[in-house]
Structures are given as structure tokens and as C-alpha cells.
A protein has these predicted regions:
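Conserved SAM-binding loop
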Residues: 21-22
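A short acidic, Gly/Pro-enriched loop at the edge of an enzyme's catalytic core
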Residues: 39-51
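Conserved SAM/SAH-binding beta-strand->alpha-helix loop
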Residues: 14-16
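C-terminal helical/coil "lid" or tail adjacent to the Rossmann-like core of SAM-dependent
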Residues: 140-197
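A short SAM/SAH-binding and catalytic strip from SAM-dependent methyltransferases
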Residues: 48-65
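Conserved catalytic/acceptor-binding region of the Class I
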Residues: 82-151
Length: 214
């Protein structure tokens, strides 16, 4: 991925993840990992040829445009910024019973308004780069999730855990569901085990080049 004499720097604000990364992936002298919050500028790290940001902006709905500006300040002229995020996150299921679908949409709406989560982050990536005058913008759309027929155990676990963690912040949403919170998750699990079920999540990849001249 890098040329001779090049280097890679991985950033994360989690000490635990950085520690894990250093233990497992930092054997090469050209790879380093540092704790850093991408909401803060990259001033102390020099300029990069390529910045790659995956599954981060969705957690900062309000701050995302400013975060992208911070990233751009850390790029060399002619460097590339690559943004990757999901769109319509957690919301694409067929044929989900109406009461369950209603709760999922209310849940994501609550996370968006009260917890700054952005289930529609992916569709905004192109506009971020376009508005900042980036050149040679390229996009790709892929399936991050594409589940039909028999579900893999790890996919079932991940989906149940994802909705379970989110629901802990909004337990009152389940008060009107027949049987409450526990019944919802029993029904949600039953839905995912049904081989007729179809679930997908779009992953949008957006790459652009910083202009050589301002």
C-alpha cells in the first residue's frame, strides 16, 4: 500500500483499540498508531498523501462537515481523501412486521436527534468533497450487509447486539410493543432466522483529490 520510504499512521481515540493495533500490526517500522480524536486538527502530524476514514462520521452528525475540513488541512496538495460510511443504516429489511419496523425507525430517529448518530451519513460524503472544491471525485456503492436465505451465526449475533445496544438508550420506545422489550427482541430474532427475510445496508465510498492550488 505504501512506496519505499513511506509510512502509515493509524489514529483512534480509544486507548484499548490503539493498544490492540500496536500489539498485532505494528511489527513493521513503517506502521505506527497514535491516540487522536479526529474532531481535533491534525496539525502536529504533518501532511499526508492519503487520508482514509471509515465508519467515523456517522457518530458525529452535527460535526461531520467540520471534521472533513480538519482532515483536508492535513492533506498535501494533490493528496486524496477517502471517506467510507453506511447509508440508511439498520433500516433496510423485508418483510419486517409493521410494528417492528416502526420501532426501528423511531429508534434511529431518536439516536439521530439525541445522540448525534447519523444513519444517513453515506449519502452526504459526495457533497462534503464537492462543496470544498475537491477534484476527480469518484464514488462506489457496495453492500456492507447482504443477507438472504440462511443467516450466518456471526451476522445474527451482530444484528441483535447492534439493536440491543441502541435500544438501551431508548427503552421507553418498547412500552407499547406487545410483550415489551423482551418480546421485541424475540420477534426480531425470529425475523432474522426466517430464510425469506432480506436485509441489506449500502456502503458508500467517496474519494477526491485536494486541488494543487488553492
Amino acid at each position: 500500500m505504501i512506496q519505499p520510504d513511506g509510512s502509515i499512521l493509524g489514529l483512534d481515540y480509544s486507548e484499548e483499540r490503539i493498544r490492540y493495533a500496536k500489539q498485532h500490526y505494528a511489527q513493521e517500522s513503517s506502521i505506527d498508531f497514535q491516540i487522536h480524536n479526529l474532531r481535533d486538527p491534525l496539525d502536529s502530524m504533518g501532511l499526508f498523501d492519503l487520508i482514509w476514514v471509515r465508519f467515523f462520521l456517522e457518530y458525529y452528525r452535527v460535526e461531520s462537515p467540520d471534521i472533513v475540513k480538519n482532515l483536508i488541512a492535513g492533506l498535501k496538495p494533490g493528496g486524496h481523501l477517502c471517506l467510507l460510511d453506511l447509508d440508511h443504516n439498520c433500516l433496510n429489511h423485508y418483510e419486517l412486521p409493521t410494528k417492528m419496523e416502526k420501532i426501528l425507525f423511531e429508534l434511529m430517529n431518536r439516536l439521530e436527534k439525541e445522540y448525534n448518530f447519523d444513519p444517513f451519513s453515506g449519502r452526504k460524503l459526495y457533497a462534503y468533497l464537492y462543496d470544498l472544491g475537491y477534484q476527480d471525485i469518484q464514488l462506489d456503492l457496495r453492500a456492507h450487509h447482504l443477507i438472504y436465505g440462511k443467516i450466518r451465526d456471526e451476522d445474527l449475533f451482530n444484528w441483535i447486539k447492534k439493536v440491543e445496544v441502541a435500544s438501551m438508550k431508548t427503552e421507553e420506545l418498547f412500552e407499547d410493543y406487545p410483550g415489551g422489550h423482551d418480546a421485541f427482541f424475540a420477534d426480531f430474532t425470529k425475523f432474522f432466522l426466517d430464510m425469506r427475510r432480506f436485509t441489506y445496508t449500502p456502503l458508500i465510498l467517496c474519494k477526491g483529490m485536494k486541488p494543487l492550488f488553492p
